[in-house]
Amino acid sequence: MAYKRVLLKLSGEALMGEKPYGIDPAIVQSIAEDVSKVVENNVQLAIVVGGGNIFRGLKGSADGMDRATADYVGMLATVMNAISLQDGLERVGVATRVQTAIEMQEIAEPYIRRRAMRHLEKGRVVVFGGGCGNPFFTTDTTAALRAAEINAEVVMKATKVDGVYNCDPNKFKDAKKYSSLSYQQVLSDEIAVMDSTAIALCKDNNIPIMVFDIFKKGNISKAVDGDPIGSLIS
């Protein structure tokens, strides 16, 4: 395996599959099976999950909600996804802990950096829910922050496209895929792969970002192996 400690960023939409809303149990099971293969190879894996399949703070704000309130609702959506993911992982025999940035002791541990790292060292998967606990920050930024905190070697951004393009491949047939690109190129060209705060955090801490297609079976293992299946930002 190319990497020994990995932060996997899963969008909420990844858990939705073909559904218009919510969580597709079959997709969760497929992701869990891929993750189990990674853990079997003694890779320490932490996961940050988004909430866009249930509620997106920015959209709530655009629809008239107070932005901070909308973001807090979005944070709760990420916890719902984290618990669902934990259930899927434990069904395939992967010991999993959920840690949340906002305390909810009846259903998850509070986020404690040292405890999270100890879980990883013991071979458990740690799923981070609740974003970073503050409004106005995306779950991509949370992924970059947690990766830096737990000393992850890479951020794996699992998404619905197979890499980073110079324009939307779903809209433009001549869209060019990058096999690799720099943090600065992403920032200066305003390439919409992650928000600028997340990119800058990874840049400042020398954490590469691998962007790949989550819906292709086995891609998580391939990405962790270092296979060139997506786009590498470094």
Swiss-Prot record:
Cellular component annotations (GO), alphabetically ordered: cytoplasm
Main location: cytoplasm
Gene Ontology MF terms in the entry: ATP binding; UMP kinase activity
EC number: 2.7.4.22
Gene3D superfamilies xref list: Acetylglutamate kinase-like (3.40.1160.10)
Enzyme's top EC category: transferase
Subcellular location: Cytoplasm
Transmembrane feature ranges: none
PANTHER family (alphabetical): URIDYLATE KINASE, URIDYLATE KINASE PUMPKIN, CHLOROPLASTIC
Physiological role: Catalyzes the reversible phosphorylation of UMP to UDP.
Protein name: Uridylate kinase
Organism of origin: Prochlorococcus marinus (strain MIT 9301)
